[in-house]
A protein has these predicted regions:
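Alpha-to-beta junction loops
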Residues: 57-61, 96, 100-111
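A conserved helix-loop-strand patch within extracytoplasmic ligand-binding domains
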Residues: 8-62, 162-166
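Short helix-initiation/N-cap motifs at beta->coil->alpha
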Residues: 66, 87-99
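A bilobed periplasmic-binding-protein/Venus flytrap-type ligand-binding module shared by bacterial periplasmic
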Residues: 32-43, 137-150
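A local structural motif
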Residues: 58-61, 79-92
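An extracytoplasmic/periplasmic, membrane-proximal ligand-sensing/linker region
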Residues: 79-84, 152-198
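Short Pro/Gly-enriched coil loops immediately N-terminal to beta-strands
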Residues: 26-34, 128-137
Length: 198
């Protein structure tokens, strides 16, 4: 079954009722699997979604780390869900995959939606229009006792709701991973830009 974001409420209820914890401050970004296509290929075929990709998958090559091909919820399940059959597949080293994409060694690649190198890649992120990949939303889980002892904490964390997009997080990761900037500097500047820190 496709992932249903509507079930997140069930999860928060279990945390609240059974574990006495609350989800407070949902940042807005989703660090899940994503599929990217070289921009030139996406433009040539008019690719915007995974369903679009399915129409032409037999003409394209697909790259991923070895473990994605082995996971029960990985390559085979993904292809089955969308009716895809790629011309060939390529096992990639995680550190070299963006270089391989840029060099045209493959057309399509699995990524994490907040990968730092995604910010600089000449690639199009496709929409998971059937909700195959589960969501990995980022937020804070805080013990209810802590929220009772420090009621100001809820107000502070709630200000973070929806403040960081996937693209924003990827850009910040890029600045830390590729440009060598200290994470605290990148975070401070971002929070200042959003008016959350002076």
């Amino acid at each position: 079954d496709p992932y249903d974001e509507g079930r997140f409420g069930e999860l928060t209820d279990v945390y609240k009722n059974d574990l006495h914890m609350s989800w407070v401050g949902m940042y807005g970004f989703n660090d899940t699997f994503g599929i990217v296509v070289r921009r030139e290929v996406a433009d040539r075929y008019g690719l915007r979604s995974y369903s679009d990709l399915a129409r032409v998958s037999s003409q394209l090559s697909f790259g991923a780390e070895y473990d994605f091909f082995e996971r029960a919820d990985g390559y085979r399940a993904f292809c089955d869900a969308y009716g895809m059959s790629f011309a060939n597949t390529i096992d990639l080293d995680i550190g070299l995959k963006y270089q391989a994409l840029a060099e045209g060694q493959m057309d399509v690649m699995v990524v994490f939606t907040t990968d730092g190198q995604l910010s600089a890649a000449d690639a199009t992120i496709l929409t998971d229009d059937r909700g195959f990949f589960p969501s990995y939303l980022c937020g804070n889980v805080v013990r209810d006792q802590v929220l009772e002892e420090h009621p100001e904490l809820r107000a502070v964390l709630t200000k973070l709701n929806g403040t960081i997009t996937d693209g924003d997080m990827a850009q910040m990761n890029y600045e830390v991973e590729s440009e060598g900037r200290p994470p605290e500097d990148v975070a401070r500047e971002y929070l200042q830009e959003k008016g959350l820190l002076s």
